[in-house]
Amino acid sequence: MSRYRGPKLRITRRLGALPGLTQKQSKKKGRPGQHGKSNEADNSKKTTEYGIRLEEKQKLKFNYGLTESQLYRYIKEARRRKGVTGLILLQLLEMRLDTICFTLGFAPTIASARQLVNHGHITVNDNVVSIPSFQCQINDVIGIKPKATSKNLVEGNLQTIKQVDLPTHLKFDKSKQEATVINYCDRNELLLNLDELLVIEYYSRR
């Protein structure tokens, strides 16, 4: 399945805030497609066990901009590793290069961070990496390609994006405009409101 490229606010009206997808908020009330009608039937559908798990899975998929096959590969990798599967899944996604660039404020969304990486503007340990899904490791240094075009693009984003406190697994050096990965992400610092256990349960029969 291809990556979603439709209206972002339609998704956030249905699933709630997805910081990796968009920072904008819809002025419309209710879920898309209701047109002012009662949402009793919709709520009934939503509250089935399958419906709840599906919605949590969709949150993860849209927030990180993944295809269904990509998400399932991360699920399988998280299962393979020792530890709490749900936490490992989130750590894998947060260690993606495009996610880290978004978290640092190099780009306003994960989708735009993906383009930033694709176009060769980002370095890892002084080497240009153009693979958005690249798995960063502890002690990796994430920087900007030393060219005016790259620096102007990222610095412009850093000045305009409303940056919240940086999570503790990243350390940013403003003077060098680079960040060091110092740990795996802390579950309590993630901006996405999600029950990852329900995502794991959704895929439990696959």
From Swiss-Prot:
CDD domains: S4. Residues 1-50 are annotated as: Disordered. PROSITE patterns: RIBOSOMAL_S4 (PS00632), S4 (PS50889). It holds the Pfam family S4. One of its GO terms (biological process) is ribosomal small subunit biogenesis. Keywords: Chloroplast, Plastid, Ribonucleoprotein, Ribosomal protein, RNA-binding, rRNA-binding. One of its GO terms (molecular function) is structural constituent of ribosome. Residues 37-50 have a biased composition (Basic and acidic residues). It is found in: Plastid, Chloroplast. Residues 1-13, 25-34 have a biased composition (Basic residues). Belongs to the universal ribosomal protein uS4 family. One of the primary rRNA binding proteins, it binds directly to 16S rRNA where it nucleates assembly of the body of the 30S subunit. This is Small ribosomal subunit protein uS4c. It comes from Trieres chinensis (Marine centric diatom). The gene is rps4.
